[in-house]
């Protein structure tokens, strides 16, 4: 492959950066970088009613967070209508397009009749071969492509193979609306040509659009980019991905505590593989990525795998980076003291073992916040309410007399208390853990005790 490869990511700014769109952007980015090419960004904002500035910013921030930095200036379709209009008029002048004056109501009537008769609807305009002397003066026309009435179009797809569509199944699509604005089909083709796009990688829901776009490419005499239509992401149940499956925006995954490196790795493995490799960091992905290793079957979103992968990436971070990320979350609602930061740092490895996301990590780190009351989970509250108060008094008395308060000494004392009360160690630790951490599952209580110290531990063992 030459270094002239140019790919593009072309979202419509009508909402958040969807997880499926993020994967499309990732594949385009990796293919471009693998071939020393360019990855371009185009905002398809011709739908003025649905496009929002907030959605544009969400796309920008989502891509930047994932590390998918684009080359060159962002292209906004809303600023290029003069270019589209000029292109449509060119086809009109060459006899490859025509003015159509048929009212939309009439077209809808024909569509409904075809539906009632269970027929495939293709609009055939009576204006296709009319001359200007027959044009009505009181109706603003649209400009339609004069699609060849015979022959076929072949989509040469690197993944789907050759897909042949007969021209008789392609209508004379509108290129320019009656208000002078371009349609999606025209804008995409003009932009891809103008931007020098060599490869189009997108979801296979665009496969039906491909034939119509190729018809426009052919009318202009443009070179058709190499196309790859990838299967969409499905939910764990095999159904089309929706919000109930977790079809959220990239920003939501960030807020849920996923790392961008982890999410990119996970999305890469959704529909692409490199042997049995699971952990693939960005530099390795750029080196390995190719279109030949794309899968033909829809990939399924699996949060268990996503969480497992994220926990791996958490453990790859250095201590200072982890502390910084934990504090970013905790400091939203609480000012963490230097002493508490030191506690968290000392207990970090114990927290990591039980964490899959940054939110898990931050939640567990609250164990080491000594200047606020312990936040008790409902199960912990129930355990405390039903615990043997005399047993807790024995624990307090045993810990008070300890001269050394390291984890070994604390553990030995708990073993003695358990034996003295004819209990198993975990029977003693269950209410103690609930009181000290507010949780039913936590890192080692013995380690927590050593880190927090006798005074803080005894304070937490006071049953209110």
UniProtKB/Swiss-Prot annotation:
Chief location of this protein within or outside the cell: cytoplasm
UniProt KW keywords: Aminoacyl-tRNA synthetase, ATP-binding, Cytoplasm, Ligase, Nucleotide-binding, Protein biosynthesis
SUPFAM superfamilies: An anticodon-binding domain of class I aminoacyl-tRNA synthetases, Nucleotidylyl transferase
InterPro entries hit by this protein: aa-tRNA-synth_I_cd-bd, aa-tRNA-synth_I_codon-bd_sub2, aa_tRNA-synth_I_cd-bd_sf, Glu-tRNA-ligase_bac/mito, Glu/Gln-tRNA-synth, Glu/Gln-tRNA-synth_Ib_cat-dom, GluQ/Sye, GluRS_core
Annotated function: Catalyzes the attachment of glutamate to tRNA(Glu) in a two-step reaction: glutamate is first activated by ATP to form Glu-AMP and then transferred to the acceptor end of tRNA(Glu).
Catalytic function, reaction form: tRNA(Glu) + L-glutamate + ATP = L-glutamyl-tRNA(Glu) + AMP + diphosphate
Organism lineage: Bacteria, Pseudomonadati, Pseudomonadota, Alphaproteobacteria, Rickettsiales
Organism per entry: Rickettsia bellii (strain OSU 85-389)
EC number of this enzyme: 6.1.1.17
NCBIfam families linked to this entry: gltX_bact (TIGR00464)
Pfam families referenced in this protein's UniProt entry, alphabetically: Anticodon_2, tRNA-synt_1c
GO cellular component: cytosol
Protein name: Glutamate--tRNA ligase 2
């Amino acid at each position: 492959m030459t270094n002239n490869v140019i790919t593009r990511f072309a979202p419509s700014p009508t909402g958040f950066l969807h997880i499926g769109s993020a994967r499309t952007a990732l594949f385009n980015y990796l293919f471009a970088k693998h071939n020393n090419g360019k990855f371009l960004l185009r905002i398809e904002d011709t739908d003025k009613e649905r496009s929002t500035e907030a959605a544009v910013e969400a796309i920008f921030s989502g891509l930047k967070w994932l590390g998918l930095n684009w080359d060159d200036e962002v292209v906004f379709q809303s600023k290029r209508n003069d270019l589209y209009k000029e292109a449509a008029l060119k086809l009109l002048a060459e006899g490859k397009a025509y003015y159509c004056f048929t009212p939309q109501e009439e077209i809808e009537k024909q569509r409904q009749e075809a539906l009632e008769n269970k027929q495939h609807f293709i609009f055939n305009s009576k204006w296709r071969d009319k001359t200007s002397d027959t044009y009505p003066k009181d109706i603003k026309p649209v400009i339609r492509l004069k699609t060849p009435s015979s022959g076929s179009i072949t989509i040469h797809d690197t993944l789907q193979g050759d897909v042949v569509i007969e021209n008789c199944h392609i209508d004379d699509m509108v290129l320019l609306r009656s208000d002078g604005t371009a349609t999606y089909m025209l804008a995409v083709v003009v932009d891809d040509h103008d931007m020098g796009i060599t490869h189009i990688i997108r979801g296979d829901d665009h496969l039906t659009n491909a034939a119509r776009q190729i018809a426009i490419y052919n009318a202009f005499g443009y070179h058709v980019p190499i196309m790859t239509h990838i299967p969409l992401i499905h939910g764990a149940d095999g159904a089309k991905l929706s919000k109930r499956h977790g079809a959220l925006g990239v920003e939501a995954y960030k807020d849920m505590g996923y790392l961008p490196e982890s999410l990119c790795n996970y999305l890469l493995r959704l529909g692409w593989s490199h042997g049995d490799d699971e952990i693939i960091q960005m530099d390795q992905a750029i080196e390995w990525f190719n279109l030949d290793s794309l899968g033909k079957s829809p990939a399924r979103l699996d949060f268990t795998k996503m969480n497992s992968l994220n926990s791996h990436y958490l453990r790859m971070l250095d201590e200072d980076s982890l502390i910084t990320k934990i504090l970013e979350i905790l400091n939203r609602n609480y000012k963490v003291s230097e002493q508490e930061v030191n506690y968290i740092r000392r207990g970090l490895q114990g927290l990591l073992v039980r964490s899959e996301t940054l939110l898990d990590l931050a939640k567990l780190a609250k164990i080491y916040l000594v200047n606020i009351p312990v936040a008790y989970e409902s199960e912990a509250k129930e355990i405390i309410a039903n615990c043997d108060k005399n047993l807790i008094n024995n624990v307090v008395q045993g810990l008070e007399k300890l001269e050394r308060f390291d984890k070994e000494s604390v553990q030995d004392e708990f073993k003695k208390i358990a034996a003295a009360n004819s209990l198993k160690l975990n029977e003693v630790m269950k209410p103690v853990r609930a009181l000290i951490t507010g949780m039913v599952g936590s890192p080692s209580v013995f380690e927590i005790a050593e880190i927090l110290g006798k005074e803080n531990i005894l304070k937490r063992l006071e049953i209110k």
